[in-house]
């Protein structure tokens, strides 16, 4: 769970 550029991990 993520969201570029806040979280560099894949959704």
Swiss-Prot record:
It is found in: Secreted. GO terms for cellular component: extracellular region. Signal peptide: none annotated. The keyword Chaperone does not apply. Keywords: Hypotensive agent, Metalloenzyme inhibitor, Metalloprotease inhibitor, Protease inhibitor, Pyrrolidone carboxylic acid, Secreted, Toxin. One of its GO terms (molecular function) is peptidase inhibitor activity. GO terms for biological process: regulation of blood pressure. This peptide both inhibits the activity of the angiotensin-converting enzyme (ACE) and enhances the action of bradykinin by inhibiting the peptidases that inactivate it. It acts as an indirect hypotensive agent. Belongs to the bradykinin-potentiating peptide family. This is Bradykinin-potentiating peptide 11b. It comes from Crotalus adamanteus (Eastern diamondback rattlesnake).
């Amino acid at each position: 769970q993520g969201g570029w550029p806040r979280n560099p991990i894949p959704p």
